[in-house]
């Protein structure tokens, strides 16, 4: 692919593009710059979340790399919703929706201005899959870079993270921790810029980026404040110029069924966030690959848990970085026969070639597959008469994989949180939160405040929680989410009543309610959906378009080649 055949020439060349060039000159372009390729540098840099506060300097270094490679970097920004400050109130409805908005916004800018390539930076949970979705949708030479996790803090009890603080709220409610100790944790648990430091959603999806080949190997687990991130960002700018000159590899050459399965294996092997089972199918959708929760489940089931990472384990992202990073996990899986080494990486080498010199697992943070922590992955997909489309349970760290108990049904998260805060529930119950799915919420809120309060009260495995909503990557305990079909789509969860006996068996991967088909049919015939407040704005559009969670909760029909990508298309 010649540099003079790039689509930015549609904007910069010819008599009719005189006004376009005038606008570009106003931004600092000169004659030489107008002859070069234009590369978008996008980030979610902002002050609304610590996750994004380290991205600006990294994006600036990517600009240097693009310039060194002979291109013109053009910076722009997009939004980020902080899950940390939107949780446990109506603002969480905006979180998953923001994934689509971010992907759409990046597409609009890159296509609207005919940029030739892209370097994308993200920090908070939904921003990572959003950027990867945009990259695959655009299918231009691109690099995705995660901004990195925060460092852990320290309190009187020792090392603390945001998860400790969230769960400590439940201990204060339960009377087992003084409020002053919680206040001290609040002040110290997040001492630097960066995302949550465990194998929660952000770090899980950063690992997915490496496994898919969209990110440089070894980049994901490095803390945000490490100066080496700046060098990685500059190399990303240089790389994208080489890929532009060579014509690839392009994102849809990297995101294949095999690499998607590799990504699922990495999630399972590390006890990663259940949200990955929502985001990986959405990334696949952008490549035109039908990859559903059933595909995710098959990989999860055959992959051993080999990394001892929080929230189910002991270690943080920094510990994994110091043990060799994501490549150590991938090499252990490759040696164990659990991933495909023939897929391409960002630089065009096969994964097996790129991992050839990777060190062996340290035996603590990461183990060899022969010494796995558990024979199957850290996330289970459950099906049964209560979840025909599937539901997700993070099993990493659980003492028991079976639970049966009567349902206590809540129509939304707030009702359940009130009950948990006032201890208006009993050990042995299954707390059911419904009407929180993608369409019914709308927005599929995370239930971290509820699950953390239960865990803090010492009830993490004494009760179970079931919802058609989502859970945070930081969630631990007997928490089953993403149950489909959701209540708003007429799923069985809508038919539950207080006292119905629910059976959970993560060994057999089943989730059932002890009701006959006839009784379920009678209830369905009599069912009346609860009234929903009128929607407007972004939520109205989202509820009208969103597809089921088992398909990734996507909002468009799937990737097709866009007919206006090259100058010749004019």
Swiss-Prot record:
Pfam families, per database record: ILV_EDD_C (PF24877), ILVD_EDD_N (PF00920)
Active-site residues, Swiss-Prot/TrEMBL: 472
UniProt modified residues of type N6-carboxylysine: 126
Catalytic activity entry: (2R)-2,3-dihydroxy-3-methylbutanoate = 3-methyl-2-oxobutanoate + H2O; (2R,3R)-2,3-dihydroxy-3-methylpentanoate = (S)-3-methyl-2-oxopentanoate + H2O
Xref: HAMAP family: IlvD
Family to which the UniProt record says this protein belongs: Belongs to the IlvD/Edd family.
Name of the protein described by the UniProt record: Dihydroxy-acid dehydratase 2
């Amino acid at each position: 692919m010649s540099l003079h055949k790039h689509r930015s020439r549609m904007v910069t060349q010819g008599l009719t593009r005189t006004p376009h060039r005038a606008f570009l000159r106003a931004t600092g372009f000169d004659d030489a710059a107008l002859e070069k390729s234009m590369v978008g540098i996008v980030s979610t840099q902002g002050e609304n979340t610590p996750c994004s506060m380290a991205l600006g300097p990294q994006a600036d270094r990517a600009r240097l790399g693009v310039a060194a490679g002979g291109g013109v970097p053009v910076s722009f920004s997009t939004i980020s919703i902080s899950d940390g400050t939107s949780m446990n109130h109506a603002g969480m409805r905006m979180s998953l929706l923001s994934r689509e908005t971010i992907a759409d916004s990046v597409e609009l800018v890159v296509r609207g201005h005919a940029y030739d390539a892209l370097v994308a930076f993200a920090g908070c949970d939904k921003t990572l899959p959003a950027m990867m979705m945009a990259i695959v949708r655009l299918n231009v030479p691109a690099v995705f870079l995660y901004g990195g996790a925060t460092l852990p803090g320290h309190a009187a009890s020792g090392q603390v993270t945001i998860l400790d603080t969230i769960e400590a709220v439940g201990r204060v409610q339960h009377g087992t921790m003084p409020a002053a100790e919680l206040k001290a944790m609040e002040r110290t648990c997040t001492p630097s810029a960066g995302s949550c430091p465990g194998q929660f959603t952000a770090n899980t999806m950063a690992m997915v980026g490496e496994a898919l080949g969209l990110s440089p190997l070894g980049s994901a687990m490095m803390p945000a404040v490490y100066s080496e991130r700046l060098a990685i960002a500059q190399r990303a700018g240089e790389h994208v110029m080489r890929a532009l000159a060579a014509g690839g590899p392009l994102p849809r050459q990297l995101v294949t069924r095999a690499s998607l399965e590799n990504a699922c294996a990495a999630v399972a092997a590390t006890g990663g966030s259940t949200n990955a089972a929502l985001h990986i199918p959405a990334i696949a959708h952008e490549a035109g690959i039908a990859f559903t929760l059933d595909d995710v489940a098959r990989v999860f089931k055959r992959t051993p848990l080999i990394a001892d990472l929080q929230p189910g384990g002991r270690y943080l992202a920094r510990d994994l970085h110091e043990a060799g990073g994501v490549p150590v996990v991938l090499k252990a899986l490759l040696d164990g026969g659990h991933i495909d080494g023939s897929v391409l990486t960002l630089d065009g080498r096969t994964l097996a070639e790129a991992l050839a010199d990777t060190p062996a697992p340290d035996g603590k943070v990461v183990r060899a597959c022969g010494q796995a922590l558990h024979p199957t992955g850290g996330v289970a997909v459950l099906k049964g008469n209560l979840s025909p489309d599937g539901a997700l349970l993070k099993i990493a760290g659980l003492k028991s994989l079976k639970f049966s108990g009567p349902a206590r049904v809540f129509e939304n998260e707030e009702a359940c949180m009130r009950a948990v805060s006032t201890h208006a529930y009993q050990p042995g119950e299954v707390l059911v939160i419904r009407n929180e799915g993608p369409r019914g919420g709308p927005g599929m809120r995370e239930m971290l405040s509820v699950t953390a309060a239960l865990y803090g009260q010492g009830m993490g495995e004494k009760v179970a929680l079931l919802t058609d909503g989502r859970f945070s990557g930081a969630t631990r305990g007997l928490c089953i989410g993403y149950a489909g079909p959701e209540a708003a789509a007429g799923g069985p969860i809508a038919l539950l009543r207080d006292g119905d006996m629910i059976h959970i068996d993560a060994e057999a991967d089943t989730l059932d309610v002890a009701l006959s088909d006839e009784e379920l049919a009678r209830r369905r015939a009599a069912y009346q959906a609860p009234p929903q407040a009128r929607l407007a704005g972004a939520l109205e559009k989202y509820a009208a378009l969103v597809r089921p969670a088992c398909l990734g909760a996507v909002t468009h029909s799937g990737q097709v080649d866009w007919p206006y990508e090259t100058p010749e298309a004019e």
